[in-house]
């Protein structure tokens, strides 16, 4: 895979969808709602002060080896080694996937705030991790016996999102790190391309194994890398898993330890795959409970209230802060894909804002249970990383 961004391969399912969605089509009333571009971002723009706070969270844990939660298969006594020997590039931030997306956080913030005071330290941290020797060690670990499903799909998807962020940067250091990461990027992409056709059912939970969220991250990588095989595998997965879904039970969410919404993550993936008019029609059948209203009547998100966090020192209960952050960006992404005067926009944007308001003040690092990962979710939201046309 070269360094230059390639034109993404696309294949349309418009004809196919026209038949499957006709029963879900709803004539939109002739009422005027604000265009998505006229409504405020769910969290407001990411400013330098917030960027510095979030960068500090990643810098604190990127090479902090302990505590460490290993997802590690041992085949012999020789596999009982410390994390920095097992996965020498990504061994901090409690677990592999959090360390990977902590690297993504720093790469993105360097890209957005190249002159910020934290950038020097961030470059040093990234250079420490992303060396040819460390990446070779990561590949060797992945290829070890019993590790075919290691960090699949969540951590692997974040690895590709890190690769995409490096590919999209014109920074000289980022170009070098991209080249260094490329062998691991290829290894991960090949694993996922092989895995998706063998996955017969999507995983519809609210934690790491969820399929839809990972597919969205992988889709964005495929758009940057120009990987045609991956794009085809993702489009096939969208058709098999989600195209005919109806009436997603949003009222059953969240489960007590969710950090992803199964319903919203699916919609956030499908808005990437489908054309805007077809997505708007599909969404009517998939989430018919989204209110249709004017801006003045959509202020209270009673249809989707933010999740309640009872104990931020509990590593599982603290997931709900992440749920609120990811819901906010998914709602924003869904709104972004709808027509400018769609009457669902006010409700979607009001709910996105309410979730962001509930979660962002909690991204402080007071408790390592959330501090090792919530910064990434805050940056993904506030920098609008999942929206088309953003840097």
Question: Model segments located where?
Answer:
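Short, low-complexity intrinsically disordered segments enriched in A/P/G/S/L with frequent Arg
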Residues: 2-11
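Bacterial N-terminal signal peptides
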Residues: 14-25
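Signal peptide processing junction and immediate N-terminal pro/mature segment
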Residues: 27-38
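Low-complexity, Ser/Thr/Pro/Gly-enriched N-terminal "stalk/linker" regions
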Residues: 38-91
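Well-ordered alpha-helical scaffold segments within catalytic/enzyme domains
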Residues: 39-46, 60, 100-116, 157-173, ...
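Solvent-exposed loop and edge beta-strand segments that line ligand/cofactor-binding
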Residues: 42-48, 83-100, 140-156, 198-211, ...
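Extended ligand-binding groove/face enriched in aromatic
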Residues: 100, 109-225
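Long, repeat-rich segments with strong aromatic
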Residues: 223-373
